[in-house]
Amino acid sequence: MAKGKRTFQPNNRRRARVHGFRLRMRTRAGRAIVSARRRKGRATLTA
């Protein structure tokens, strides 16, 4: 049986729009994610 196509098709603009910093700062939950990652000491906060 044939397998499906590869689902990860890299695209930097889409990556930023879907997981980026400005998107995270837009909602309360997103800001919570960024602050949690800061608290944990993550080197990268968002995409």
Swiss-Prot record:
<dbReference type="InterPro" id="IPR020939">
    <property type="entry name" value="Ribosomal_bL34_CS"/>
</dbReference>
<keyword id="KW-0687">Ribonucleoprotein</keyword>
<dbReference type="GO" id="GO:0006412">
    <property type="term" value="P:translation"/>
</dbReference>
<protein>
    <recommendedName>
        <fullName>Large ribosomal subunit protein bL34</fullName>
    </recommendedName>
</protein>
<dbReference type="GO" id="GO:1990904">
    <property type="term" value="C:ribonucleoprotein complex"/>
</dbReference>
<dbReference type="GO" id="GO:0005840">
    <property type="term" value="C:ribosome"/>
</dbReference>
<comment type="similarity">
    <text>Belongs to the bacterial ribosomal protein bL34 family.</text>
</comment>
<dbReference type="InterPro" id="IPR000271">
    <property type="entry name" value="Ribosomal_bL34"/>
</dbReference>
<dbReference type="Pfam" id="PF00468">
    <property type="entry name" value="Ribosomal_L34"/>
</dbReference>
<dbReference type="GO" id="GO:0003735">
    <property type="term" value="F:structural constituent of ribosome"/>
</dbReference>
<keyword id="KW-0689">Ribosomal protein</keyword>
